[in-house]
Amino acid sequence: MAVALRARNAVKVEDGIDTSNIIEEVDDNTKGTRSRASRRRRRRGDEEEKHSEEETYNEFNDDGTLKTEGTLQTGNGSGRPFELVAGLPCSLDVPQYNSALTFPLSVRDSGVLYSSLLSSRRTWISGEMFEVYWTRANKVPSLAIKDESIIKELESSKEQDASGKDRMQRMCDCELMAGPHTFSIKLFIVKDDEKEKKWQEEQEYKKKEKEEQKKLESEQRKKRAEEKKQMLQLKKQEREKQMQLQKEARARAKKEQAEARQRQKEEERQRKLMNKERVKEQKASTSKPKKDQNKKNSDQHMIANLNIMAQRDPELKKLMAKVANGQANMQEIEEFKRVIELAKNLPPPGTPPAKPEVQKAQSKPTDSNETSADSSKSEILQESKTNESDKKATAEQATEPKTHSEENKPESENQSRDNSEKSASSHNQEASIKKEADANSVIKKESSDGDGNKSQQPKRKYNKAPKVADELTEKEKEMQLTAFQQKYVTGAELVLEFAENTNFRFLLPKKAIIQYIPESNRYKMSWLQIHNQSDITRFYKRQVKELTRRIHNAEEKQRVTDEYNVFRDKKCPSPLFSSMTVTFSGIHVKFNSIMMNSFDPKEEVRGYMEDVLAVGTRLSGYNLWYQLDGYDDRELAERLRSELNEYEQSLKPKRQKKQ
């Protein structure tokens, strides 16, 4: 039957025959045969008797060709240049229509081409080139069967049908292109118990690993919380310790401040007593009249003004130096006298302007410490200016009487001593006030950091994470495999079902080479169809049993079985094979990994094919006779046309048949 299949697929056109409108010609031919339908039915009995007498014995020769025994009967009872293989005229040689046919019929009237296409399609749908995996149970009414054994057998077959069907899950719908035919098929994935078990173990392992990870994270969170708690406790203790130190520093600062104020009061009291005593001594020691004192003061002011004027005018400074050294002439002396008169008329240096004095007189001091500090500063400034003017006017003071300087000396010493005491007391007071202010600021800062830490800390703002769409895009959804399909990304066992024959499902061969064509999204599958596979399988089992008979170790048995190559055994029957190629189209891209990884590795398949090609025999094809003789082959042509007509009528709906 496989040889006939190859012959039907080997469609050849000889002698310039046009087959472009073959189907239309066959349809016209079948219309012409309707008028002879009644005559055909009358002769059907005779034809069946003739066909029953025909016997054909097909066997394979050593070279793979078909061997026929007996006599082939034809329609006219005489020898013909072709043989009937599966009811179709075939020959090994190329048909010679001009020499073999006396009255050749057209391709349309012969009906061989369309019949061969129909027979080839039926052969593909019956799955003769595939291994049957599942068969639908017979749907026979149980009431019509009285034999209990048959009923039990049907029930068991139904149970097997249900269990086998449950082991297959539909993958996709697609198209299968084989030769000139295109079939609508469904692909299924066969459930594998080992893969399911392995998948379950992996899921349990992942679940266990996830639980351990979750437990570890929980322990780490607890540990971090404990460390944080301890850190907060340490911070709290440190803060309390700091607060205690601050309290002690504050108390110490207050104590020092009180001592400084007490010391300042004591110094103020002592200073007042000393001033009173000094005034008494000054009054007692003063013997000169007040006029001399005023003169002395005016001379001092004049000298101070001269010094200031000399600092501003370099020429005046040179003039003063000449007069002091006795080098000035009369004109320069007269000029110096005018300068002296001018210096006498000027106000004393350091005299504040009138407006600040009025404001100072009108302002009321609020703090005794501030007034004393300001007065001490003004006195120190006045004394420093006076001392400077005294140093610069040493030349003029040399002409003054000595008694006048000696009398003024105690007063200046007492005044400078008083000013130094005032400045020292003011400096001490300012230092104590500054120290107290620093201590208060530190205490306030620490207390705010310690007690009011929670209130002053800014609230933490949590930025909400952008919402991630839970639903995937349409494209990602389409590319998503189901949980079951993800288990069989590699090593899946695929089953196909023809839409024209849903009672059978066939396994795709594992020892095949699959090729993906991305431009057209198609898969091309090629394999070797061994027609005597059953004989080779029986021989393989006998040899493996013989090789492993004395081996008791299971692993060793498995190793020997895997290493044994039946095609390299010289006693192995010679494989009779045909090369097959089909194309799958319409399969979604997401199933690419399943399709490409569901077959044996290419290197292994290539080695298997090389072994078969080395020792096997490729079956030769037949050539169909698309034209028959109008007289010698009229009965054969009539039978083919009538069968085509019946097939065409079966395809029409019932409503059209009635018309």
Curated annotation (Swiss-Prot):
Complexes and interactors: Component of the SWR1 chromatin remodeling complex.
Annotated compartments: Nucleus
Amino acid composition bias (Basic and acidic residues), ranges on this chain: 44-54, 203-299, 376-421, 432-452
GO CC annotations, alphabetized: Swr1 complex
Composition bias type Basic residues, residue spans: 33-43
Gene name for this UniProt entry: SWC3
PANTHER family: SWR1-COMPLEX PROTEIN 3
Cysteine-cysteine disulfides: none
Biased composition regions of type Polar residues, renumbered to the chain: 360-375, 422-431
GO BP, one annotated term: endoplasmic reticulum organization
Presence of keyword Lyase: no
Family statement: Belongs to the SWC3 family.
Full protein name: SWR1-complex protein 3
Biased composition (Pro residues): 346-355
InterPro entries: Swc3
A GO term, aspect molecular function: ATP-dependent H2AZ histone chaperone activity
Region (Disordered): 28-68, 203-309, 341-470
Keyword Translocase included in the entry's annotation: no
Organism lineage: Eukaryota, Fungi, Dikarya, Ascomycota, Saccharomycotina
